[in-house]
Amino acid sequence: MEETLRALSESLNALTNVVTGIKEDIKKNNDRLAILEQERGNADPTVDQPQPLVRARTEYELREISVLPDCVKELQAFEGRQEAYLSWINRAQSILTEYDLIKTRPLYRAIVLHIRQKIRGHADMALAAYGVQDDDWDDIKRVLALHYADKRDLRTLEHELGAMCQGSRPLDRFYMDVNGHLSLILNNLKARNHPREVVNALIETYRDKALDVFIRGVGRDCSKHLLVRSPKNLPEAYSFCMGLQNVMSRNFTAQNYQPSGAPRFAGPYQHQARPPFRTPFSPGSGRFSQNSYRTQGPRQAIKMESNRSGQSYQSGYSGRQEEGSGIKRMSEGNNPFQKAQRLYHMELAPPPLAPAASGDNQGRSHEGYYDDESQAVERSNNYPPQKNVEGVTDAPHNLETEGGANFMTNASPVYRT
């Protein structure tokens, strides 16, 4: 009996030791599980760990990826324009969402590679600079959003949308600006982690706000008709404004014989091709430039040379002297103090008879007489009259007309007062 009891006690002790070891192992495993759960709880549950896409390994798979869907082939290329980023990234994401069921097949990787080839220009250079893999779509979206996504928050976009108005812009440009701003707001809402019902309610709210901004910001004539029409959405309001504007523009383009004033607004699709020229601001000048209002002085007179072709040097002496002195010469007919003296108050006296010369002396006397008379005629024609000592004016006379009868004598004619 004692041996049996001893054997049972040893067996119980061995079993107790085994149970104790099992308990320790279970405790260790529980501690490890707690640590793993804690690490998993600290991680972001929305971020999935990227898994490498499956490559084609068989001939059948290669034959399958050689035929890509038409929607992938017709996708437009993205060359790095910021205004086209949102529309392009949404189209590419919608294509990949449709083929999300075959994500573990080589065809999905072929679609991602083809979309990567659509990225060109500066966007391609940005992806190459970051070392992005061609088949990593999540990393491609992250780099493109870093470079081309709008960095404004929702409040800023909402404030800018409420302050928009048409102004001098054409109607189609104003509609594109409002619609583009609304697209930025909707994309910002979709990127948030809100419930689907909340996102849909916010989208409808901002669509109504964009419609209200378009109605209040458009021209006064269209705004009145839009308030009466009460369109339901933004495209309907734009379509109504385009039709109204085209109808109202007919009054100014058609032939009309009735007097009419200036059009109240410009016709459709009219825009200014070139911005108005503005004079650069200068701190030293006033508000208006005075250069164009200054009185321009008279132009400088050009001195003309006298024509000496028809006169001798001696006859033009008085004119040259007056030109050099700067005194303007007046005509003799307009100056009463320099009129030519008339000989109406004088009478011609007969000359005294001179003894006749004989022989050669008579001929020589006549030759000297003719020389003296020719010099006297030239002097009288070139010089103005002068006064003698007694106050009698020696007027110029023409010996050829007045003393023609006395040329054959040796004496000169004598004038008496």
UniProtKB/Swiss-Prot annotation:
Keyword Repressor assigned: no
Recorded GO CC terms: nucleus
Name used for this protein in its record: Retrovirus-related Gag polyprotein from transposon opus
Polar residues bias locations: 287-298, 407-417
UniProt biased composition (Low complexity): 308-319
Keywords: Transposable element, Virion
Magnesium listed as a keyword: no
Main localization category: virion
Chain residue ranges for the region called Disordered: 258-333, 350-417
Localization per Swiss-Prot or TrEMBL: Virion
Start-end of Basic and acidic residues biased regions: 320-331
Protein's organism: Drosophila melanogaster
GO biological process, one term: DNA transposition
